[in-house]
Design a protein with these regions (language model features):
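A structural signal for well-ordered alpha-helical scaffolds and beta->alpha junctions
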Residues: 1-3, 31, 98-102
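Generic structural signal for conserved hydrophobic packing positions in ordered secondary structure
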Residues: 1-5, 39, 105
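Short, flexible, basic/aromatic active-site loop/helix in glycosyltransferases
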Residues: 1-28
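Hydrophobic transmembrane alpha-helix bundles
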Residues: 5, 9, 14, 52, ...
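A short, conserved alpha-helix in the catalytic core of glycosyltransferases
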Residues: 21-23, 29-47, 52-80
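Residues at structural and domain junctions
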Residues: 28-29, 91
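Active-site-adjacent helix/loop segment of glycosyltransferases
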Residues: 61-114
């Protein structure tokens, strides 16, 4: 949560990973919701995306529930690429996107006991 606040106040985000340095397939904590592949059985077992999230943190929550409910892990495959044209409208302090993002982070922290 404090990394999120710091990224807005001071403009730096220590949680971003330089993906150009990742050359191996590996297990990760979570993956972006803009490009996920999930077995239908796993998706249905966890109840899909939590519709109480709006635009932000739904992918973190989904990956956390996959692991906690099924024991499955999220796996990053280096050879698979996708291009996501993200607008990043959540970067302006106190914009509606910022507030949605903040709301989702608070929800995620409370639900996951982060």
């Amino acid at each position: 949560f404090f990394d999120f606040i710091e990224s807005y106040i001071f403009g730096k985000n220590r949680t971003i990973i330089d993906k150009s340095n990742i050359n191996d397939n590996q297990y990760v904590d979570w993956a972006s919701g803009s490009f996920l592949m999930i077995l239908v059985e796993v998706y249905e077992r966890i109840g899909g995306f939590d519709e109480h999230y709006f635009m932000y943190c739904e992918d973190l929550d989904l990956c956390r529930r996959i692991h906690s409910v099924t024991g499955e892990k999220v796996f990053y495959i280096n050879e698979v690429k996708a291009l996501h044209f993200a607008a990043h409208n959540n970067r302006r302090l106190f914009s509606k996107h910022f507030l949605w993002h903040l709301q989702s982070i608070i929800r995620y922290c409370l639900i996951s006991k982060y």
